[in-house]
Amino acid sequence: VKRLSIIAGLILLLLLSAPVIALFTLGHSEAALRYVVAQLPTKAGSLEKLQIDNVRGTLAGGFTVERIVIEHDLVYLRIDGIRARLELLPLLWQTIDVSDFEVRDLEIAPQPRNQPPPTIARPFLPRLLTLEARQTRVRSATIRQSTGSPVIFKEVTAHGTIRERRIWIRDAKGSLGNIALEANGILKAAMPLGLEAQAKATFASRRGPRWVARVNTDGDLENLPLEGGLLEPFVADLDAASLRALPPWNLRGAAKVSKLDFTRFGGSAFFGDIAGTLALDFDSTGYRAIGALESPGLDAGPIDVEFDGTFARNTLRARTLKLAHAPSRLRIDTSGTVTFEDAGPALALSGRWQNFRWPLLGDDTALQSERGLFTLEGVGNYDIRTEAALRIGTLPLMRTVIDGSLQPGRFVFTDSRFDFLKGTSLFSGELGWRPDLSWKITGRIKD
């Protein structure tokens, strides 16, 4: 009996140690790893293609994969330059614990659905299986759209946990051009997929104010209600805004603008805190906003605003920016680019105005111009050039060309030309508003 007990104990010990031995062998053998990868199915259900190229190393000691290509009925993924290491012991309790996971390039692109859509929510992993991804880093992640420019994120880091019906993303950080991003969220297996997330975006340059936006959401990818908005350098609170995160994506809603103070940008305090409401309509073809803003300093009622543009690779491109004041018939049309650089926003704008008068309201007109052209270019100190037909009070019409520099707290102009009657005047000078209003002008007049 004693001998049988010993034999039974040895057999039990061998049975219990067999998984550990097999796991140890798999974890430290490159040949075993390649064999397991070769046995993976290349197609399964909605997975149309799985391709894994050039696997080297071991699970426990660290391994590399040259490329993984995944083609799903809705999305295409290509992952290049993979490096990772697995902790072996957690595999015994059905946990895949990945550490030091790094990807050189990740590309995601939508694909037209070629299979019937699922009727029930599919789990992310088999029941009781857990995947832990620690110290995850993606050097470059590109999201391509069916239309429009791709979105490229750099140096993305995060911690993640995947279970049967939940994916947790913690402490995600990265950059979109010069915009720093932070996010936390939970993706939920549902029809459609559910998402609970918090995100923050920050742009800080050497010149100019800091830009900060925060957004929270809790919904599904068909309809994600958005709360939050822009916090600095002015406030733009989202109102009744929602995002469709599935292709074709779109964002609809409104932004309630307040505390827009030009002194934050080096401008004059004359305009006061500008406020108003803009209707938002964003999608892959562009970003559109329409509404009205009001300046207490102008005291002229609302000014209609219309914007249509795109954003890609650090550059906001204004196809058109229109400002209109119905009572005075003033209209300003602008187009060009704003590029977010380390030194500050770089402007390259041009436009025209019609029916400008000052003041905007009232019977007495000190200055008026039926039409004119302008350009605004530079970083920090912005070069301005205007060409216009100008009338001051009751004086005859004059032709003007003004070249100047808009700097924090002042406007400096040099050799600006005024053609009046049969003579020409050349003026240089400075108009300042910080800390106090000041001005000086020098010039000469010639026949």
Protein language model annotation of sequence segments:
Residues 1-46, 75:
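N-terminal type II signal-anchor transmembrane helix
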Residues 44-53, 273, 369:
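A short, amphipathic edge element
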Residues 51, 68, 118-172, 225-227, ...:
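Solvent-exposed beta-strand/coil patches in large extracellular/periplasmic or lumenal scaffold regions
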Residues 54-143, 168-172:
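Flexible beta-edge/linker motif
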Residues 59-60, 163, 220, 281-283, ...:
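Structural motif
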Residues 62, 67-69, 99-109, 134-139, ...:
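Small-residue helix/turn framework positions
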Residues 73-86, 114-116, 147-159, 175-184, ...:
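Amphipathic hydrophobic-ligand
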Residues 256, 281-283, 288, 356, ...:
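N-linked glycosylation sequons
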